[in-house]
């Protein structure tokens, strides 16, 4: 990420891209796993929901500028597109390396409603998840059932 302030942050300096999308079966359902920059790749979350994920775990450390501009809208979009809960723990505060992270750990329901927003202060938060909401939302808006491979793009003359 290149910020207008001249700051440059590269997850790729510490992490490499995975070769597979990962889900894990848990007591609350199938959990799709992703981190930080992954949030920007809608196709990953389509794959996770196609694999049966009913909740998505997305821990992250967004900078304050990118967080203010993108964090809430992307988290809500991924919840809506996947018709799944999003559980997103977020680093917050001022850091020794000069970073200032946005915070705002979130829990978002499958309809895109924010159930918990922790703001910029550190802390522990709790949200009650209605596990029936996933099935209800998927019945109301069957986007996963209607998802299909995108055909090749044609360039109009």
Residue ranges with predicted function:
Residues 39-125:
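CN hydrolase (nitrilase-like) catalytic-core segments centered on the catalytic cysteine
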Residues 127, 132:
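Glycine-rich, small/acidic residue-mixed loop/short-helix segments
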Residues 134-157:
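A conserved C-terminal secondary-structure "cap"
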